[in-house]
Amino acid sequence: MNSNTHAKSSNFHQSELDKFAALANRWWDADGPQKPLHALNPVRLEYVSTRLELAGARVLDVGCGGGLLSESMARLGAQVTAIDLAPELVKVARLHSLESGVQVDYRVQSVEDLAAEQPGSFDTVTCMEMLEHVPDPTAIIRACASLLKPGGKLFLSTLNRTPAAFALAVVGAEYIARLLPKGTHHYKDFIKPAELAAWLRNAGLQLEDVSGMLYEPWRNRARLSSRTEVNYLAYAVKP
């Protein structure tokens, strides 16, 4: 399926969409190809929920994939809209939402298009493990900023561009331990926290925090950490 038929935006790599669409049917399999993501999800949720009252908040999840974080936030009372450019992933997310009885408004739509339609509409925007997979992450951040209400919060997670990240997230996870399919990540697209901070500032957002997220494959568990050499989370506020 040509995943870009449902969105105007060209800010994506078709190969990236196809790669993740191929994982759609096993997205919710905690022991499947997305096993590390299942381990990271509680940490992502903790990071968001300790900085925001999710109950009643209007939240947008950008690059929602099969809906792991979207459903988790909805379970805590958030009114969640979730978007992705891969129809296969959105279909899986919708089906799981029906099965679980958790209400999420899933859409095949780009964040840029949604920003043009509904600026200033959300209390919070989350964009997790996505920026390193698009051609122009700065455009994603600008669109996310546009979608926030004044005082709204943007939560992000991505990978640092360091030798440690290359060794662990690419070589170790994809080729040695085979925790992820080969080709999941491209080191050149990883993002240093200083770069992310500049992009947020240029989008009119104020960076409030950067925290490391440590994945322990031998336990299949993740936790927040002061170390940001590999995975890290950040949040910023719209004045």
Curated annotation (Swiss-Prot):
This is Ubiquinone biosynthesis O-methyltransferase. CDD domains: AdoMet_MTases (cd02440). It comes from Xanthomonas euvesicatoria pv. vesicatoria (strain 85-10). GO terms for molecular function: 2-polyprenyl-6-hydroxyphenol methylase activity; 3-demethylubiquinol 3-O-methyltransferase activity; polyprenyldihydroxybenzoate methyltransferase activity. Belongs to the methyltransferase superfamily. UbiG/COQ3 family. The gene is ubiG. GO terms for biological process: methylation. Its EC number is 2.1.1.222, 2.1.1.64. Pathway: Cofactor biosynthesis; ubiquinone biosynthesis.
